[in-house]
Amino acid sequence: MTRTHCALAVLAATLVTAPAASACVQVGVYQDDPAAQLPVLQKRAPGVRWLSAYVTGGRPLDPALVRLANKRKVGLVVSWLPDGGTDGATQPQYRLTKVTAGRYDKSLKALAKRLRTVRRGAVLRPMPEPNTPWYAWSGTVNGNKPADYVAAFKRVRKVVRSAAKGKVKLLWSPYARSVPETPENALAAYFPGAAQVDLVGVDAYNFGNAGDLTWSAPADLFAEAYAAVQALAAKPFWIAETGSVSTGGDSAAWVAALGALPAQMPKLAAVVWFDAKQAEGDFRLTDKPTLTAVKTLAKGKC
């Protein structure tokens, strides 16, 4: 997705027991206004466990999000975006070498310390979707290389681990399909190593049949990426961002199909729905069948 959809926003996640799966699967919903939307979601889908925010560069994590997470008794997931908070990948002042050189060490330490105050646990998701050309930290633009991303991720981990005192988990989250699909931009080129991550995952969306696109089932989007990521590290797997439009198919059935994925992906630990409207598509849970499907998905308890 574009940098626009990575603006400061929030998701809430619930634990479910998916069909044919022995492990719990966290189901998340990305939302624009968590203070207003999270309580409503918790009423409609009991068992909410996570709240997640996007934080840009050296900016601090809004303490109101921590207070909200603690009040609603959820954990906090933070996606960290080392740029200036504007669209566009070509921003030389935000190249990955700046991260590795320690430009953000102070703000990362502050972020880690604040995350330690979340009572239900915290996850940090640094520099998501690096195998796309959309961001200042992407590995094929802005003077970056995949190796620069690996070095930057390791720097983030080192700083956060020291400040977090073991209370923050790190999630590595590329896009499910590399853009462009070239050998040098392969998903594996961005993997920092199994010892550097606690969780692994990918993002992907069903954009329906708009333009020259075709309807994509969840298994079509994630099966290949799941296999590739698990080959790198057999760790808990997150579908860190996803959503489906209604144009061209049945979005409620699409959500139900998410519940069947653990049968094919036994390490699947979380699914996060992008409950918002963007230029790329309208993924909001506004129609009753889709909302009901999400509610059903969120009924189970671990």
Task: List each language-model region with its residue ranges.
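Boundary/entry segment of secreted carbohydrate-active catalytic domains
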Residues: 22-59
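Substrate-binding cleft of secreted/luminal carbohydrate-active enzymes
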Residues: 24-32, 121, 236-302
